[in-house]
């Protein structure tokens, strides 16, 4: 019987009928929109409840007929319910599935935020000429940024297991806006160093996103979803070099950092509107949280191996990128920053490899992917050294080193989350801190070798680091993991 044909004896019966009908409409729209359970403690539910109570009182004191009031309540309640359900943020459940709109938001924001680490690479030569400093001092900008990133990974990312991740992310976006503006307005190299350190520390946001993709994806989709987020991250790295090279040539290197600050504001708004609150998984104090990192390192040898061999390979990767601007600025290229940035497009092959590696890492095996990755990086360095005075040799080297690096990074990073799923942020902290410490070491060694031996020295240190990563893989056998207490 529809409500227009129904008769009520008192207001209490009307109120009961309203609540039953309202819950039914909620359930219908939940089923249609695939939205999680309606939370009765939600403020909007309470608002609806007060609305019903108001109309109940309205009827009881005789100010209106039950039938007309009932029609009004249905109209208002339906509008309220639909408005709420369409705007409600999805509640995430572990292994319950990650909605596509959240997954792609994570991937896009990861790419835009990680780009802050790499804007400087095509601009180093331009910055050096404007500030009148040495190549070594200029190269320290890239190294300090990577060190800052490692610090952020070590001390901030673990907080995702202790506090709500959304608050951590928004705080870091706020600090990023100020640090990027400081770099753009810096009068000397020393302020750039300090602001670059803060930029590096706060740019660890993507490494909070990666555990989210792993933790809340269905088991069969974990590798694919982690690969999508990392693909977004890699695309951001590649695009950062292209964009900064172009902007540096057309507008100037300072303007690039002002634009980046504006992009961080947009990312903060996106996270605020789309990402749901995620409850922490660790109970205790920050000191206990940090101590648990050492327990994880001690108890899981595979975690140490995965992290170290990937970090050493990343050092080889960044050795190339940190000195490429200096190489391309000399004979026979004499290239400007926009040309150096365009070379970043060659790494699109590496970004496209990420989701593929994530999908097949279980079938092919971590060990095999590491052999493939190291082999490709060694071929890259051969091309960069023996054919380094031709665009063909440089492009081939960039392609090979990007694809090889993704084979190593993604196979190892995807596998670490299987070691201890309940400590996903801390496991990722250990991996990525080691990873970027290796990157910082490679950047520093490459800068020193460039000063002494030029491009041959850079190729030499890159090859040595790759061989060391390969040796670790050869000597290590994959192990099964016991659960972390």
Spans of model-derived segments:
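Helix-breaking motifs and short loop linkers at transmembrane-helix boundaries and internal kinks
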Residues: 132, 164, 185-190, 387-388
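Helix-to-loop junctions at the C-terminal end of transmembrane segments
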Residues: 153-164, 353-365, 450
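Cytoplasmic helix-loop-helix junction between adjacent transmembrane helices
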Residues: 197-231
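Intracellular juxtamembrane helix-capping segments at the cytosolic ends
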Residues: 205-217, 407-420
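Conserved MFS/SLC helix-loop-helix module at the cytosolic interface between two early adjacent transmembrane helices
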Residues: 151-187
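Juxtamembrane intracellular "pre-TM" segments in multi-pass secondary transporters
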Residues: 89-96, 276-307
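C-terminal transmembrane helical hairpin of 12-TM major facilitator-type secondary transporters
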Residues: 368-408
């Amino acid at each position: 019987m529809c409500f227009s044909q129904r008769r009520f004896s008192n207001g209490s019966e009307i109120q009961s009928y309203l609540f039953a009908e309202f819950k039914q409409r909620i359930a219908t729209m939940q089923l249609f929109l695939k939205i999680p359970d309606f939370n009765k403690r939600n403020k909007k539910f309470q608002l609806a409840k007060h609305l019903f109570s108001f109309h109940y009182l309205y009827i009881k004191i005789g100010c209106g007929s039950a039938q007309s009031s009932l029609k009004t309540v249905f109209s208002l309640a339906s509008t309220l319910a639909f408005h709420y359900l369409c705007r409600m943020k999805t509640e995430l459940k572990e292994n319950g599935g990650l909605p596509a709109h959240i997954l792609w938001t994570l991937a896009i924001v990861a790419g835009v935020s990680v780009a802050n680490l790499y804007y400087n690479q095509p601009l180093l030569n331009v910055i050096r000429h404007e500030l009148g400093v040495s190549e070594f001092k200029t190269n320290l900008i890239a190294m300090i940024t990577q060190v800052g990133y490692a610090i952020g990974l070590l001390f901030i990312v673990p907080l995702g297991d202790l506090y709500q991740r959304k608050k951590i992310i928004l705080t870091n976006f706020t600090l990023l806006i100020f640090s990027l503006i400081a770099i753009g307005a810096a009068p000397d190299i020393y302020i750039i160093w300090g602001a670059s350190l803060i930029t590096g520390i706060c740019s660890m946001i993507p490494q909070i996103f990666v555990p989210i993709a792993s933790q809340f994806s269905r088991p069969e989709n974990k590798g694919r979803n982690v690969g999508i987020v990392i693909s977004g991250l890699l695309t951001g790295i590649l695009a950062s070099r292209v964009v900064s090279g172009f902007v540096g040539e057309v507008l100037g290197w300072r303007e690039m950092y002002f634009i980046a600050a504006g992009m961080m504001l947009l990312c903060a708004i996106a996270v605020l509107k789309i990402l749901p609150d995620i409850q922490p998984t660790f109970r205790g104090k920050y000191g206990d949280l940090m101590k648990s990192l050492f327990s994880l390192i001690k108890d899981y040898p595979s975690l140490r191996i995965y992290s170290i061999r990937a970090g050493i390979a990343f050092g080889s990767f960044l050795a190339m990128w940190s000195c490429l601007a200096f190489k391309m600025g000399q004979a026979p290229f004499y290239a400007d920053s926009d040309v150096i940035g365009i070379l970043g497009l060659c790494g699109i092959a590496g970004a496209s490899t990420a989701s593929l590696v994530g999908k097949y890492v279980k079938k092919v095996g971590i060990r095999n992917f590491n052999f493939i990755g190291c082999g490709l990086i060694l071929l890259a360095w051969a091309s960069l050294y023996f054919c380094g005075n031709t665009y063909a040799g440089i492009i081939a080297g960039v392609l090979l080193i990007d694809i090889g690096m993704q084979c190593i990074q993604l196979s190892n990073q995807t596998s670490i989350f299987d070691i201890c799923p309940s400590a996903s942020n801390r496991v990722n902290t250990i991996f990525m801190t080691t990873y970027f410490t290796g990157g910082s070491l490679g950047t520093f060694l490459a800068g020193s070798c460039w000063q002494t031996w030029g491009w041959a020295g850079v190729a030499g240190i890159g090859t040595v680091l790759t061989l060391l990563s390969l040796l670790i893989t050869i000597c290590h056998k994959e192990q099964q993991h016991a659960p972390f207490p």
